[in-house]
From Swiss-Prot:
Listed GO CC annotations: plasma membrane
Positions bound to heme: H121, Y125
Underlying gene: ccmE
Topological domains, Periplasmic: 29-159
Species assigned in the record: Xanthobacter autotrophicus (strain ATCC BAA-1158 / Py2)
UniProt keyword terms in alphabetical order: Cell inner membrane, Cell membrane, Cytochrome c-type biogenesis, Heme, Iron, Membrane, Metal-binding, Signal-anchor, Transmembrane, Transmembrane helix
Pfam family, any one: CcmE
Chief localisation class: membrane
Signal sequence extent: none
Name recorded for this polypeptide: Cytochrome c-type biogenesis protein CcmE
Positions on the Cytoplasmic side per record topology: 1-7
Length: 159
């Protein structure tokens, strides 16, 4: 084999190894590449209880209930809804009808226990498919409801 031929074989083998390494890395990071999953994706993919993930969608109107530091609410994408329980201080932008991303684990009963909650201020953080589905159903609110116009938060008895 000539010197030029050996060089081509060496370069080809190096590129093959790099492609294989990139494929293995992407395969290992598959679940963390997606910023969040919608309630419909969680229902369709049959996510195992205890699996850590990020759940994103809109806070369903009339679903927020506060009891001390525990807040329960429902996240919807218009097709499916997941009940979320969060213990902690909610972000200032959190309100009904507004976009939210909750990070935590799915529970055996199908609810979601969030460790952290991020309020989204616009559609930039929502997948185009979710935004389009909400617009088609007439549930999309550009920028969310104006301050003071959201439905009042329900208080649990005795809180």
């Amino acid at each position: 084999m000539t010197r030029k031929g050996r060089r081509l074989v060496l370069i080809g083998a190096g590129l093959g190894v790099l492609a294989l390494a990139a494929g293995l890395i992407l395969s290992a990071l598959n679940d963390t590449i997606v910023f969040f999953r919608s309630p419909t994706e969680v229902a369709q993919q049959q996510v195992a209880p205890g699996a850590r993930l990020r759940l994103g969608g809109l806070v369903e109107t009339g679903s927020v209930v506060k009891s001390g530091t525990l807040t329960t609410f429902k996240v919807t994408d218009g097709n499916a809804t997941v009940k979320v329980a969060y213990s902690g201080i909610l972000p200032d932008l959190f309100r009904e009808g507004q976009g939210v991303v909750a990070e935590g684990a799915l529970q055996p009963d199908g609810s979601f226990k969030a460790d952290s909650v991020l309020a989204k201020h616009d559609e930039k953080y929502m997948p185009r498919e979710v935004a389009d589905a909400l617009k088609k159903q007439g549930r999309w609110q550009e920028g969310g409801p104006a301050p003071g116009t959201a439905a009042p938060v329900q208080r649990a008895p005795g809180s």
